[in-house]
Structures are given as C-alpha cells and as structure tokens.
Amino acid sequence: MKVGIIGAMEQEVTILKEAMTNCQTVSKAGCTFFSGQINGVDVVLLQSGIGKVAAAVGTTILLDEYQPDVVINTGSAGGFDSSLNLGDVVISTEVRHHDTDVTAFGYEMGQMAGQPAAFKADEKLMDLAEKALAQMENTHAVRGLICTGDAFVCTAERQEFIRKHFPSVIAVEMEASAIAQTCHQFNTPFVVVRAISDVADKESPMSFEEFLPLAAKSSSEMVCKMLELTK
C-alpha cells in the first residue's frame, strides 16, 4: 500500500518528514512532495500550501503522478464541538465547503454544482484512525463533520453562520474539502485527521501561532500510529 499524506504548512509536515526514511524531494507548481517510507510503509508526503486552490492543485498532482491507494489529510483545525480542547484530535466522517453558495439553483448550502453536498470519508480509514487513537495515551478525539473555507474563522458572525448552516460541524479549517473533492473525482479513499489548535467560544492562554507546533505534533503522532497499524 502507498499512502498519500497532505499538510498545508511546513509546521504540519515537519515531524512526518523527519520520520521518513529514503526520502526524496520534488517541487512542482508551488508544492513540495517527499517520498519514502514511514514505519515501513511507502508514503508520499505533500506540503501543499494554504487554502483550497493550493490543496486541490497539490492533491491532483499527488493522485495523478504518485497514485497513492489512500489519502490522509493532517494538520491543525479550529474546534467547534464543545467537548474539544487544544491538542484534541478530530476525525472526519464527512467534509463540506462552508464558503460555497449556489443555493439559488437548488443546491444545499456548501454544495458545489455537480458535486455531492458532502464528501464521505472512507470507513476503513476512519476505523484505522480509531484503532490508532486507542493506542495513544491521553488523547481525546471526536468524529464528525469538518467544514472548509478560504478564511480563518475568527469572528462571531462567521461562527454563527457556520453553526446555522452546518449544525453538526465539529471543526473548521482551510484545505480538507478541496482535498476531499479531488479524491472524490479520482475515486481515492480519504480521511481527515487533524489536531485542534484553537476552539471557538473558548479562551486560550496561547495564540494559534503558539499552539500550532503542538497541534502538528499531536496530528503527526496519530498519522504515524495509523501507518504502523497498516502493516
């Protein structure tokens, strides 16, 4: 099995890159691809850049040129579920765009014309994430809907909009729906496994920038454990 792993920022892929053996690096279209092995599993690690367009470009190249069997999207996310705290993990059951609106033509909020309203994560990959979680100490995870948009959600108005239209949302971020849509079009199974770097409506002693390395550590450890369990 070959596993594609996607993170947007350098901080989100550094730990995974350092865990890789026989690493080869290729840069293309503003993306960086690291191919090698982690825990004995063939992987291609993509640092895509931030946002949906960058994620879609990188994922397309990843799927077309490297042809992984499955894709895992890792990194950080903003928590919307009240049980989440900094460093907790979210596992996608489905992913939706929160900044897409063609409802005037009869589509659901968040649904792009010609696409499903939600992109369903792969059941086997979700179960693999749960098994990895069971082997990690002191790690809390929530499984559910993750929503994506090309905006850092930091205002009460935007939070209220997302909660109104996507009431079951557990977390938001800026790449997953583009990755999920691209995987859907390539018929490649995917799952999103991210760690919480900030939580809506909760005060934090640390800023997003300060907590990002810790969130990256948590999500990377989860991905490494998933890879270990694939053997």
From Swiss-Prot:
Record-annotated active site: 12, 198
GO cellular component terms, semicolon-separated: cytosol
InterPro entries listed in its UniProt record: MTA_SAH_Nsdase, Nucleoside_phosphorylase_d, Nucleoside_phosphorylase_sf
Protein name: 5'-methylthioadenosine/S-adenosylhomocysteine nucleosidase
Binding locations of substrate: 78, 153, 174-175
EC number assigned by the record: 3.2.2.9
Gene that specifies this protein: mtnN
Recorded catalytic activity of this chain's protein: S-adenosyl-L-homocysteine + H2O = S-(5-deoxy-D-ribos-5-yl)-L-homocysteine + adenine; S-methyl-5'-thioadenosine + H2O = 5-(methylsulfanyl)-D-ribose + adenine; 5'-deoxyadenosine + H2O = 5-deoxy-D-ribose + adenine
Gene3D superfamilies, per the entry: Nucleoside phosphorylase domain
Pathway(s) served: Amino-acid biosynthesis; L-methionine biosynthesis via salvage pathway; S-methyl-5-thio-alpha-D-ribose 1-phosphate from S-methyl-5'-thioadenosine (hydrolase route): step 1/2
Gene Ontology molecular function: any one: methylthioadenosine nucleosidase activity
The organism's taxonomic lineage, starting at the top: Bacteria, Pseudomonadati, Pseudomonadota, Gammaproteobacteria, Vibrionales
Leader sequence segment: none
Family: Belongs to the PNP/UDP phosphorylase family. MtnN subfamily.
UniProt cross-references to Pfam families, sorted A to Z: PNP_UDP_1
PANTHER family for the chain: 5'-METHYLTHIOADENOSINE/S-ADENOSYLHOMOCYSTEINE NUCLEOSIDASE, 5'-METHYLTHIOADENOSINE_S-ADENOSYLHOMOCYSTEINE NUCLEOSIDASE
Role noted for this protein: Catalyzes the irreversible cleavage of the glycosidic bond in both 5'-methylthioadenosine (MTA) and S-adenosylhomocysteine (SAH/AdoHcy) to adenine and the corresponding thioribose, 5'-methylthioribose and S-ribosylhomocysteine, respectively. Also cleaves 5'-deoxyadenosine, a toxic by-product of radical S-adenosylmethionine (SAM) enzymes, into 5-deoxyribose and adenine.
Keywords tagged on the record: Amino-acid biosynthesis, Hydrolase, Methionine biosynthesis
Coiled coil: none
Any one GO biological process: L-methionine salvage from methylthioadenosine
